[in-house]
């Protein structure tokens, strides 16, 4: 049975600091790219060094296991100040695992030992990750004091009206986790309707955006949704809402 390591440093947002400076390390990341700030932040927080060829791989898909690795690093950074300290405690136990599992297991077991990830994805670590699976990996990564629900009311209203995030229903895998990312400012969707595209594969660029919004409050977003018409009658009296017509008696 795996033992849970004792971690010396106190956990907290004060551990989420940028320890590096991004100076163009990724050859495929122009400064005007949508995810430039996110990918640069991922490097500066010590969460990624990119791919072997010197690129970040913005449009490349990610496996479920790779999302788990990034999540494990963030959790460890929050808990210890070191993105690898937590998973490292499980590295010896992972030596007996085969192939990619040997790489993924320390991060997976670490997250599970922390109680922030279940076993739902254990059998698909080598498969391409969907955006819904990414949401499941991230949803409980930090406590609410570190990841507050800054958009709770707006997202609740937009979703309940079925005018926003319409491609996510109660039958969508991990739909509660997806909605939590909206409530926390980690996602605002991919179009004006706030669509999440839960079954689409997550790219490394889109993943970088979500990951760094988890870590850095300054990168979190609020949807630009105008829902005022939903409450245009708030405070109105009944007689203001109902047009009184002419009385016509029923025929005898």
Regions found by a protein language model. Name each.
Residues 37-45:
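Mature N-terminal segment immediately following signal peptide/propeptide cleavage
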Residues 203-210:
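C-terminal/domain-terminus segments
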Residues 2-34, 49-65, 72-105, 112-132, ...:
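Feature responds to low-complexity, polar/acidic, surface-exposed segments characteristic
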